[in-house]
Amino acid sequence: MREHRYSIELPHTAERLWALMQDYDRWSEYAPMVLAVEVLNAGDTAGNGLLRRVIYRLPFGRRGAALELVTEVEAARGYRYTMISREPGNDQSGSVRLEPLGGNRTRLHFEERYHLTSAPWRWFEGPIYRFINRQNELSMRRLSDWLGQHPEYRADLVEPAT
């Protein structure tokens, strides 16, 4: 099993980051691999049990899709997810956590665990996930960049300057 952890400090409130993270129609605007997100089941009022299909780019113009089950949702603080594989044993899991730092700053923590069991994918697990990890980190940076380029987006969630 492999694990990837990434943390970054971002110049936005946790609430504003959360709002954009929950705005699935916009994921393709900042996440380089994401083409679309389809919400298949909205889950409960907090978002627990949300089931989403993430459609993403693959090399050579191909497309892939991942089913993600979202749990342990705490609004503006984080959630856990499980990527449900077609084959038993290939599920992946991860979490996103937002740590408010005050002054319109938040530390975003991202982690993901994966273990490919099927040939030929398991032979290429290292290179595959190095690529995916770089794309995930880029998505987190571009999430912040997108908010910086769109100051009008949920401006009500920006802390007033003191």
Task: List each model region and its residues.
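Hydrophobic-ligand binding "helix-grip"
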Residues: 28-29, 57-107, 113-115, 145-149, ...
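Hydrophobic ligand-binding cavity/cleft-lining segments
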Residues: 1-44, 161-162
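A conserved amphipathic terminal alpha-helix motif
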Residues: 114-162
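Generic structural detector for well-ordered beta-strands
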Residues: 7-9, 38, 55, 69, ...
